[in-house]
Amino acid sequence: FIAFFSVSAIMACNSNVSKSNEGNLQINQVPANDDSEMTVLMREMYDNFEIIKDSIVAGKTVDRILFNNVRRTHWASPTDSTILGPAFEGKAVDFLDKVDSLLLEKVNKEMYFNFTVQACLNCHQEFCPGPIEKVKKLLIQPKH
């Protein structure tokens, strides 16, 4: 789960995040041009989080495979290796704790999903603010 958070943070640094078609998992993308491994992983995770969000909003079961790539953040090379360190790792741990809670939650999935996205935003605010507005779009808005 730490990997997932790390990936989310670095993905956010790249403003050219692609959106997958609903239901398509993008787990094994090859970096294009000069994209770092972390950037590619962040794109995959963003796409997966869109699918997770749609499933939660529709009241469907979230496919756990959508979380399979989060641990890759431990070995994916970031665009800027200077971000790696105790502060970044702390944000990653927080994010992965949120992912664990989301996976265990049975009733308040929307709330726990938003907690997880907020953990992404917290890291991006400190390390990579570029994609913050895009990541905010993942938040599930309250029903009126």
Roles of regions detected by a PLM:
Residues 1-4:
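Sec-dependent signal peptide recognition
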Residues 116-128:
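The canonical Cys-X-X-Cys-His
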Residues 9-12:
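C-terminal motif of bacterial Sec signal peptides marking the signal peptidase cleavage site
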Residues 16-117, 132-144:
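Extracytoplasmic c-type cytochrome modules immediately beyond a signal peptide or single-pass transmembrane anchor
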